[in-house]
Amino acid sequence: MMRGSTEIDMPESSSVSKGTAPLIAAPMKEKGGYKKGIAIFDFILRLAAIATALAAAASMGTSDETLPFFTQFFQFQASYDDLPTFQFFVIAMAIVAGYLVLSLPFSIVAIVRPHAAGPRLLLIILDTVALTLNTAAGAAAAAIVYLAHNGNSSTNWLAICQQFGDFCQKNSGAVVASFITVVIFVFLLVLSAFALRRH
């Protein structure tokens, strides 16, 4: 007579190691790591804006041309300080460039602490003010440069750029540089808005 084999389930002893779960979860990577990349790009754009703003102010501020012919009583000369609009342009672009230089430490703080909202909020407010000043100066100077190139027959304003070519070329370059600075400011404001998002 054969004995039937029986299986007996034995409980595992306490010495057998079971799978253990860690009591403290591993720290997850903090969300919003893209904010540091935005802050670095913001810093680079500010350096570019400093260059364009200084170029605009320097180009306009050094625009001076004297025609080689003159009479006994008249000397034909054109300079930026002959027009208050161009004087305003030089002063405004110098202020914008100075502000951009002073904003660099705040941009560095935003790189070191990308989740800090205070410096970013301050920059977005001051950038808006600087953008307004920059746009006003560029638009005013652009109107005068347009008249210098084309004149206005209704008011008998003659185009002077045929005679003062170098003067008009420098002024036109300054206006273009100022509007490049405007575009950079718009990008800075968009970046700051993205950086202030909570999610």
From Swiss-Prot:
Q: Which residues lie on this side of the membrane: Cytoplasmic?
A: 1-37, 109-120, 195-199
Membrane-spanning ranges? 38-58, 88-108, 121-141, 174-194
Any Gene Ontology biological process: cell-cell junction assembly
Q: Which residues lie on this side of the membrane: Extracellular?
A: 59-87, 142-173
What are the alphabetically sorted keywords of the record? Cell membrane, Cell wall biogenesis/degradation, Glycoprotein, Membrane, Transmembrane, Transmembrane helix
Subcellular location per UniProt equals: Cell membrane
One Gene Ontology CC term in the entry: Casparian strip
Look up keyword Zinc and say if it applies: no
Q: Name one Pfam family in it.
A: CASP_dom
Q: What is this protein called?
A: Casparian strip membrane protein 2
Name the species this protein comes from.
Populus trichocarpa (Western balsam poplar)
